[in-house]
Amino acid sequence: MIPKILNDVTEAVRNEKIKISEGIEGEDRVASLIDEGTVIDFLLTTNLSKYITKNKAREFGDMIVLDYDGKTQYVVNIKTSIGSSDNATSKIGFLYAFTDMKLEEMPGRMNWPKFLELIKSRKADIPNKDYWFICVDKNDSSNVTIRGAKQINCWKENANPSNMLQIDWKKEKVLPPKIQTYDEAYDVIVNGILRCILKFVYNLPKEWKDKVRETL
């Protein structure tokens, strides 16, 4: 289920047909940052502005959306995509989605051992507590999709440790949000990260694998 406020935010962006930045050669992330700011700045001019808080640099997610109930908060990551796969791995975002931890409890940075410790000790199935993505199509900015991480159908697992879980937006956009249990989503995302790491180790040269074993 997608909360009404998030559907309303998505519809506002869809109807505005926001101008998306031209790609900057070798600097795709720069263009994406510009687009994220453009989307949030637009929302702050609408009647939804009182529900929108722009996150500071280095905070997880790009904005916080307050529910109409005046209490519930949704962490939203804004993506602009040409329909290709996009890196969507976020330790803090996933930790928030799968635990009872509040926004003010989230660590600034953490390693994987700390991530696993917290996600196991604070594990909680809370409806609509998720790490949300709003994806705007770079080729047609009226094509906007809203998904929670737990609702994604098209996760891709990679052996690249800096780019592990990706979303295939081209496939995702034509599908309805995935309905699955908390445990099923946990396996896809949290255990999916483990599978990515194992793939990375498996692809190492034998000499390096031996060094890894010695270190462990």
Feature map (PLM): residue ranges:
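Nucleic-acid endonuclease domains
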Residues: M1-E59, Y68, T80-L216
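Conserved catalytic cores of phosphodiester-cleaving nucleases, focusing on short active-site segments
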Residues: M63, Y74-I82
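Short acidic/polar mixed-charge low-complexity motifs
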Residues: G70-T72
